[in-house]
Design a protein with these regions (language model features):
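Short, surface-exposed loop motifs enriched in S/T, G, D/E and P with embedded aromatic residues
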Residues: 27-35, 134-141
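The feature marks proteins involved in alpha-glucan
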Residues: 1-7, 34-116, 141-222, 230-232, ...
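Short Gly/aromatic-enriched secondary-structure transition segments
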Residues: 24-25, 127-129, 138, 176-181
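Short beta-strand elements bearing conserved aromatic residues within extracellular beta-rich modules
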Residues: 18-20, 122-124, 160
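Substrate-binding/active-site clefts of carbohydrate-active enzymes
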Residues: 181-183, 202-218, 222-362
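An acidic- and aromatic-residue-enriched active-site/binding cleft used to recognize and process polar
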Residues: 117-119, 127-129, 165-167, 261-263, ...
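Short proline/glycine-enriched turn/loop motifs at strand-loop junctions of beta-rich domains
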Residues: 11-17, 115-122
Length: 362
């Protein structure tokens, strides 16, 4: 609201024309194109906040109708949670950052948040905006560099990345560090939404409470996916579950320690260079398939220990390495130089945000 009325401003460099449909008006109101960069504006003689829909026409004459992402305002979140995240004492940081399918003012969509303190700009890109980082630019909402945007009408299952502009001229595409799902290696993208819920074996849950390593000995088999003698091109999580079940029953192990369960993009054969700490590897199926593998092992009375490495992470350009141009998660120069073949760098543990990230992922 301004003194003269209700000002609507839209930046759509992909649009030929933009109009708005206001609930209190029968006809759409045409926005004036203010400059060639794609800035549109209109002043509506109404002295109150109104709900409106954007009608965006592209160069092919196709019109897209959507709610303005910037008309919703900030999502309510206690400052205490943001402060705990910055202090390294927020142990459920995945509820604060990443993507969340939710509603705002009765409109469904996806809320995105990411931490990038050194970035000049952060945008959400995907097929839904033709991977154009100029369209859904995020708002910096905290002093320590958390960015946020709510994109209405977006649904679960959409592939996306963050386009991050560094100081200078560099612009890179990054996976969401808090994404619960990541697609396959070559075209790795983060995916909106949560994996489907899978009900665990009730009998196993009760049995697990009784097994504490005191009244019954544990025998643990350490195994990595790459070591399983199956056809890697065709194997899936259920194939792995069947192989492990057969092997464990033949050898008498009670637990399996599985290495390399998080998303790893380095192809050196090592399981240390993790790139996705909240998403299981998509090489053998979806995150939901991974849950079914866990359930199948539990159905056969096999306990599971997931190997989780918080000592260092991978240097794939799509991952958290140099995430915001200032390497907020780690160090620009790897500290573990005696093992360069592992393609890893170390975490900056002195930063509270990094500690919250790691503890929350356990």
């Amino acid at each position: 609201l301004v003194k003269e009325g209700y000002l609507i401003q839209v930046f759509r460099p992909d649009a030929v024309s933009v109009s708005v449909s206001v609930s209190e008006r029968k006809r759409a109101i045409q926005l004036e194109k203010v400059d060639d960069a794609g800035f549109f504006a209109a002043l509506i003689p109404i002295k109150k906040n109104v709900k409106y829909v954007l009608n965006i026409e592209d160069k092919n004459g196709h019109i897209t109708r959507l709610r303005d992402p910037y008309s919703f305002g900030r999502f309510d979140k206690s400052e205490v949670i943001f402060n705990k995240f910055a202090a390294g004492t927020e142990y459920n940081a995945y509820n604060l950052l990443g993507n969340k399918v939710c509603e705002k003012d009765g409109i469904s969509g996806v809320l995105f948040r990411t931490w990038a303190p050194n970035a000049l700009r952060v945008s959400v890109v995907g097929e839904f905006n033709s991977w154009d980082g100029r369209i859904y630019q995020m708002e910096r909402i905290t002093d320590n560099g958390i960015y946020e945007i709510f994109i209405p009408q977006l649904e679960a299952g959409q592939e996306y990345m963050y386009e991050i502009k560094f100081k200078g001229t560099n612009t890179v595409l990054k996976l969401d560090p808090y994404a619960r799902q990541i697609t396959q290696y070559a075209d790795a993208h983060s995916v909106t939404g949560e994996p489907q819920a899978v009900q665990d074996n009730v009998k196993w849950v009760k049995q697990r409470k009784q097994i504490k390593g005191v009244n019954k000995p544990l025998s643990i088999l350490e195994i990595a996916y790459d070591n399983i003698p199956v056809n890697k091109a065709k194997v899936n999580y259920m194939d792995i579950a069947r192989y492990i079940t057969e092997y464990v029953k033949d050898t008498g192990y009670t637990y399996v320690l599985i290495k390399g369960s998080d998303s790893i993009f380095e192809k050196t054969g090592y399981c240390y260079g993790a790139s996705g700490y909240y998403a299981p590897s998509s090489q053998y199926g979806t995150a939901t398939d991974f849950k079914h593998m866990i359930k199948e092992l539990h159905n056969n009375g096999i306990g599971i220990i997931i190997d989780f490495n918080v000592a260092y992470f991978g240097i794939d350009i799509r991952s958290i390495v140099n995430y915001d141009g200032g390497d907020c998660y780690g160090y620009l120069k790897p500290r573990i130089i005696e093992k360069p073949q592992m393609n890893i760098t170390t975490f900056a543990y002195e930063k509270g945000e990094v500690r919250s990230f790691l503890i929350s992922a356990i």
